[in-house]
């Protein structure tokens, strides 16, 4: 579905996305079931912040907590910490997640006081989790690469009507603690999909490839989201290759 969408074949992309959905979420015998509220709210120190049951393919890395600590730990200084502007109540978090019931807002962001007595907003998706029964072992070291929710977003993007698009997006919404929506224009649809990529795949890299595929000339500003946008050029979407790989080319 991803490849067909990149190739511009929306009909085939939709067909492939729906095939994954239909085969992966057969009622009563789901291969990739939606995350449950119990897994989100009732697991104490080991919530499934990854929504692991929805992941089609992932990397397994026993050093995941090291990556969390190197990039997202609240004890890092301001030049090292990857985080949003503001805090849970003000800044980018409430702009991106306006509904406080959004599972992703509750599970992926927190505030703590650091060693200089400053309250720090930090990203928690990859915090270490463990429990005596071993329930968290299935997602403790997981880095998601493909999710069932992406199939719904591809289906929404390639749908033939706004009502159909809203139907696919609402499938995600009701499993994120959110109300259903209606869509009134294609511009609104595009904005909703853009925001879903930002919320759903934060810390996973898929938003970058969405922006690249759409060749977006501007992306949301991290400092003043909802107000400013960062201008993009085509070259910004290209990763520099190592000289050892390019020096031998003719």
Q: Would you name each region that the model predicts?
A:
Residues 2-74, 80-88, 97-250:
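Acidic/polar-rich alpha-helix caps and helix-coil junctions
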């Amino acid at each position: 579905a991803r490849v067909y969408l990149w190739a511009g074949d929306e009909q085939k992309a939709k067909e492939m996305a729906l095939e994954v959905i239909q085969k992966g979420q057969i009622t009563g015998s789901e291969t990739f079931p939606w995350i449950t509220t119990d897994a989100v709210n009732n697991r104490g120190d080991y919530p499934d912040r990854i929504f692991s049951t929805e992941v089609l393919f992932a990397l397994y890395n026993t050093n995941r907590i090291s990556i969390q600590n190197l990039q997202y730990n609240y004890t890092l200084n301001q030049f090292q910490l990857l985080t949003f502007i503001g805090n849970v109540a003000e800044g980018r978090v409430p702009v991106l997640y306006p509904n406080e019931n959004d599972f992703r807002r509750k599970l992926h962001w927190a505030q703590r006081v650091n060693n200089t007595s400053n309250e720090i907003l930090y990203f928690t998706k990859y915090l270490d989790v463990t429990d005596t029964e071993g329930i968290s072992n299935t997602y403790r070291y997981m880095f998601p690469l493909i999710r069932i929710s992406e199939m719904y977003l591809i289906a929404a993007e390639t749908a033939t009507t706004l009502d159909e698009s809203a139907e696919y997006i609402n499938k995600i919404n009701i499993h994120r603690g959110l109300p259903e929506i209606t869509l009134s224009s294609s511009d609104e649809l595009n904005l909703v999909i853009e925001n879903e990529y930002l919320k759903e795949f934060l810390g996973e890299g898929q938003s970058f490839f969405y922006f690249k595929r759409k060749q977006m000339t501007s992306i949301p500003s991290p400092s003043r989201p909802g107000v400013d946008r960062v201008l993009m050029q085509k070259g910004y979407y290209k990763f520099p290759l190592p000289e050892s790989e390019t020096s031998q080319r003719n």
